[in-house]
Structure formats: structure tokens, C-alpha cells
Amino acid sequence: MTHFPWLSTIVLFPLLASLAIPWLPDRKGTTVRWYALGVGLIDFSLIAYMFGRYYDFEQTSLQFVEDITWIDRLHLHWSLGVDGLSMPLVLLTGFITTLATLAAWPVTKNPRLFYFLMLAMYTGQLGVFVVQDLLLFFLMWELELIPVYLLVSCWGGKKRLYAATKFILYTALGSIFILLGALTMPFMGIQGVTFDMSTLAYREYSLPVEILLYTGFLIAYGVKLPAIPVHTWLPDTHGEAHYSTCMLLAGILLKMGGYALIRINMNMLPHAHALFSPWLIGVGVVNIIYAALTSFAQRNLKRKIAYSSVSHMGFVLIGIGSLSEAGLNGAMLQMISHGLIGASLFFLAGTTYDRTRTLVLEEMGGLATFMPKTFALFTACSLASLALPGMSGFFAELLVFLGLVTSEAYSPTFRAIMTVFEAIGILLTPIYLLSMLRQLFYGRSIGRPKALIDAGPREVFVVSCLLVPILGIGIYPKLATAIYVNTTDHVVQHVLSALR
């Protein structure tokens, strides 16, 4: 049974299934909605079954490996595999995409194209996490680009074209560096041409070449993460995109940047990574503090949450740069945690907009009286975002914090300074999140509150599904860390051994 092509099936099924959408007999979009939800459920069920039945928690090498020669002259292989770095993100992708199809239920404008793009994006995102061929990685990275552009430009707000154009310009610029790196690394060295990422991880490069490759990849993945100063596309895109698209962006797309930094920059270019690591920590600290302060100043609800995402992804940069097992484990857990929390906050922001028809915080207020269920859900997700003990974010940030403090790669002075700034950023988080809750749900009611409708069964179900793993991981972190801890420890040891 393990010889079954699990990964090819999981990756290609959403895209192939989406091709049937134009021929579905449907006038109002109901059939299309149920069809897309069914595709998401089937694919996520396959992922869950593969993981539960066959995944080996102790193994650090690739599992479910598929390697088929695709284009021989180009040395291009259909090479797939998962390990501890990719398996939790594959699970996260399937889970959030399935919920996003349900979140998109109110979309009435051309639902056929909307769900077609969502499923195509699903394939691209899964592909990024499972492919093991560097050129194929680039192709999958690009596959999700066009669907996001169309989802934002066709179903966004008033400034959707500006936001979509800004998104594609930033990401296309980053993609150029990925392509250059993907066409350079395989042809260097005496071992022969190969795009296999596992082989390239042990290939020797001169330090100047490694630094150039690392810089290009860092720019590309920094855009996706996003890292300051290449982050400005994110607030605009989140501010204009439909909230179901925001769930996919915050929950999955940002994680592609963090994953690629670990898989390619850290694992394949260890010498350059050691040189850049202090800068990663510095940028991570800037992410946390600058984005937290900027979030506090935002008047738009979705932009406020978007800047909070930039702040939280700073912990991922610090964990990756810490050169410690605890730090990298924390970075992985932060990606999982933020994927769940970010998706829940954007979903709630969108459903609140559906009722109030505004995202300007000054035009809201006093909603707790009229929308108690929305208030309770928003409060729970906000507390999770500020890393309340018992929630997934707490243990993630704690691991990153400990990873930096205990790292032997840096001087005590550097660790102390960065730790102080990191702590300041942690203290800023509750300021902007609790301020957001106060502006939304407390104070004087504005507008016509009698017309407001509280969260319905669909909204409660979606947020509850996200809160269950947030609480589960917060109470028992090993639910998540057991999936990847052996692999992340192996990656850290690989980097440290390369430096000896």
C-alpha cells in the first residue's frame, strides 16, 4: 500500500477536479460550492489518512518518495517526498483550504471561476511543500501566483487592482531570483547536473557563490514571509482581498517563505546561512517591533491584522537565525500556530464586515451587545494571537525565545540585546490586539445595531475548527512538535557540522 503514489494524488487531485467546474450544471453556484468543498474534504482526508497510517515520526529522511524522469534533456524529474519540515505544512494546507472553501460560501460573483482558482492555488501550495526537484519547486511556486492575483483583482475591494498589481510585482521580482538560483546550483560542482534538493544539500560551493545564491533566495522568500522592508504588499493585499482569500494568504502562503528559508537557504547553503543568521535575527526583531507599532496605528481592521501577521512572522526569522534546535522547533511551531490564528482572525474580520459594511474601526463600537457569539470568538482568537498560555502561540514564542537565549553561536552580549528587543515586541502585542477588541466591541454603538446579525452556524463551525488545534497544541505541544522535531534537529546539526 505504501507504493501507492500518495503525494502525486494529493497534489494533482484538486487541479484535475477543478477542470470539471465549468461543466457543472449550476445557475446560482450552489453545486459549485458543494463540489469545491467536497474536493477539499476528499483531498484533506487523503492527507490525513496517509499521515495517520504511514508517516514515520522517527524518520528524518524523505518519506512517500516518488521520482519519475519527466524531461530527460532538462534533467527535470517529477520528484516528490515529505519529511518533518513539510508534513505539518501539508496538513495545515489541506485543513485551512477546506475551511476556506466553506468560508467563501457568500461569494456570488462568478463562483465557478472563484473556486477553480482556489483549487488551482491549492495544488500549487501543496506542490511547494512536497516537491524535491529545485526546478519543479520553482514551477509550483509560480503556479499559485496567478490564482492569487486573479482572486484579489476580481473579488477584492475598491483598490483591488492596485493591491493585486503590487502583489504580483513583488512576488514576480522574487521569483526571478529563485529561477536564477535554480538554474545555477545544479550546474555547479563536479558531481554532475542534478536538480535533486537532497543531493544539492550536500554539494560544496565556494563561499562567494554560496553568499550570492543565499542573497537571491533570501530576497525571494523574504517577500513571501514577509520580512521588512519587502513587506508592503501584504497590508494592501489583505486589506482588499476577500476574507476567504486572506485565510489562504495568512494561513498558507506566508508559510511558503519560512519553509523555503529552512529547506533551501538553511539546509542547502549552510555556510552562508551562518553568516546571515545574525542579520535574520535583527530583521526578525525589527519585524516584531515595527509591525506591532504600525498595527497599533491602523484604522482599518484587516490592515491591523495584516501587520500583526508581519510581527508574528518575525519570530520565524529569529528561530531560523538562532542556529539552535529549540529556536528552529519554535519557528516551525510558530508557522503552524500563526497559520491557524491568522486564518481565524481574517475570517472573523470578513464576517464582521459582511454585517457592518465597514472595516474602519472608528465606525464600529459596542458590537458585543448585539453580536455576543462573534465577540466571544474574536476574543478567543485575539488571545491566541497574543500568545496567551494554553494557546499554541505561547509555546511557539517560548521556544524561539529559549532558542535565542541558549544559542551557543552568538556572544552573550548579542543574545542579551536581541532578547530584550524581542521581549519588548512581545509586550507590544497585547497593546494593539486589546485595543482592537476595545474599538470593535466596547464603547458606544455606532450606526444601526438593531440590523446586525450575530455569527451563524457556518461562522461558528469554521472558527471552532480552527480553535480546536490552537487549544490542543497549546495544552499539549507535542501534538505538533512530534511530527517535525527529529527533522529540524537533523537540519540544525547539518548546518553546525558544515561549519566545523
UniProtKB/Swiss-Prot annotation:
It is an enzyme of class 7 (translocase). It is a multi-pass membrane protein. It comes from the Eukaryota. GO terms for cellular component: chloroplast thylakoid membrane. It catalyses: a plastoquinone + NADH + (n+1) H(+)(in) = a plastoquinol + NAD(+) + n H(+)(out); a plastoquinone + NADPH + (n+1) H(+)(in) = a plastoquinol + NADP(+) + n H(+)(out). One of its GO terms (biological process) is ATP synthesis coupled electron transport. Keywords: Chloroplast, Membrane, NAD, NADP, Plastid, Plastoquinone, Quinone, Thylakoid, Translocase, Transmembrane, Transmembrane helix. Its EC number is 7.1.1.-. Pfam families: Proton_antipo_M. It is found in: Plastid, Chloroplast thylakoid membrane. The chain crosses the membrane at residues 4-24, 32-52, 87-107, 113-133, 134-154, 167-187, 211-231, 242-262, 274-294, 305-325, 330-350, 374-396, 417-437, 460-480. Belongs to the complex I subunit 4 family. This is NAD(P)H-quinone oxidoreductase chain 4, chloroplastic.
